[in-house]
Amino acid sequence: MVDVEKMSDAELRAELNVRGANVGPVTGTTRSLYEKKLKKLLSGGAKTPARPTVAKPAPKPTPKSAPAPKSPKSPPARRSIPRAAATAANSTINSTFNRSEIEEMSDSDDDMRDDDDDDEEILSPKSKQSSFRSANSTASSVGRGRPVSSTPNKRLSPVYKPSPVPKNTPRTTSSSSKTTINTTTTRIPSTPRRITSVPGLITDFTPSFSTFGSDRPGATPPRKSIYTSKVSKVLHDLGNTTGEEDDDDEFEGQETSRIIYKTEEPSRRGIVKNAWNKVLGYGFDASKNPGDSYDLRAGASRIRVQKNPRTGKVTVKQTNIFNEAIYFALYVILILFVVLGIAYALTTTHRPKTADFSGYWGVLKAAGRDSLNFFYNYAILPVVSLGIFVVLGAGIYFGHRKYKEAKEQEEAKLYELIERITELIRESSIDGDPYVSQPHVRDVLFPPAKRRSAELARWEQAVKFIDTNESRVATDVLVLPSGNECAVWKWIGNQSQKRW
């Protein structure tokens, strides 16, 4: 018994070819399938068909006197290239096969199909060409010389699925008879084939891309580069790309968007919108001729650049948008005053005494006086009063806050001075001086340039705090040899030699 698993790829392929099986390239994924197929052939008792003895080579007949080859009975009719095209291309491959070998191939296929329905036939274009090509033939394919293209005219080969053959079909075997088969394809099917449609398989590239959801090489559909519908105008900014998106090396060299959106033309603004933009500082004007005059804005400043067409000099004027807003508010108040005066004149109960100009003039003066009183009582006086209250409240708040901050700073300076005085008294005690004069400490800490009223007032507060609250220091009065009294401090705390 031959050990199939120890065979090399070439030996496995040769054994399968000898037993009439169609073998493609033996790889890591197909070897297990071919091993199963060879084991089944060996276990089924399939014998190696006897190779026909090669007789003397007969003289090659001319194309005119060559007899027509007999077609085998077992394979069904199939598509073939016309005789004229085949003769012109010189692509006919003549191969001699034993009829019993062909029938054994169909028997082995039937047994395999009955035993295991899950095993599928693996075919590749290279294996189909190499398994049935004659060693001495040097013919070329029919389509040699045509350029390889991926245009929509390219067609892919359909998928063939073998159909089962009934068991009771009579088969005739003749081992001695030989049949010469004129093949125009790269493979001879052993059983009738039928075309089975596979969902999702693309067998033809057509100009219609209704069923395609993505781009195909060589068959790019026409694209609409401009969206003109009203609904798509809101998506104009979606096709824009930034430099950050193009920094990724993974998509380098690839376009980020195939859609070019149409730039929306600026719409015409009305009077109200122009006035509002002018108040906000966005109402820029530019001349029809480029470079004659235009506006710029930098923060709260507006810059007007204007070119003199005669001299060619450029004039730059700078204004502030807040000034324009103030003038605009004054204009609004004036317009409101005029409207109120007209409304008062039309609705007042005071009628002109005379129907001449003096009578109507009196009504207009009364309307102006009443309008001013209205503005003063309901606009100016409340605003001024509110402003005064706001200023007073803000002054009180910020004044109190400033007072607290100054008080905290003064307390911090006072405590810092107390620490310095205490440290000086302790150091004097360590050096061997039991008493320290208060004026001496003052002169050391405050030179004559710093003896101002604020510093002297802080010194008095520090002396008072030490005499009252400091337990490590005692205050005494010594009488000097001159008879004068002097206030001194004495350190009565810990006599440690450490210097802090």
From Swiss-Prot:
Residues passing through the membrane, by range: 326-346, 379-399
Q: What name is this protein filed under?
A: LEM protein 2
**Protein source organism:** Caenorhabditis elegans
Q: Does the keyword Transmembrane apply?
A: yes
Cross-referenced InterPro entries: INM_ESCRT-Associated (IPR052277), LEM/LEM-like_dom_sf (IPR011015), LEM_dom (IPR003887), MAN1_winged_helix_dom (IPR041885)
- One BP annotation, GO: microtubule organizing center organization
- Write out the function statement from the record: Nuclear lamina-associated inner nuclear membrane protein that is involved in cell division, nuclear structure organization, maintenance of nuclear envelope integrity and nuclear envelope reformation after mitosis. In interphase cells, plays a role in anchoring and spatial arrangement of chromosome arms at the nuclear periphery, forming so-called lem-2 subdomains. Both arms of autosomes but only the left arm of the X chromosome are anchored in lem-2 subdomains; sequences bound by lem-2 are mainly repetitive chromosome sequences and inactive genes.
Q: How does it assemble?
A: Interacts with lmn-1. Interacts (via LEM domain and the C-terminal nuclear domain) with baf-1.
Sequence ranges assigned to domain LEM in this UniProt record: 1-45
GO cellular component annotations of the record? chromosome; nuclear envelope; nuclear inner membrane
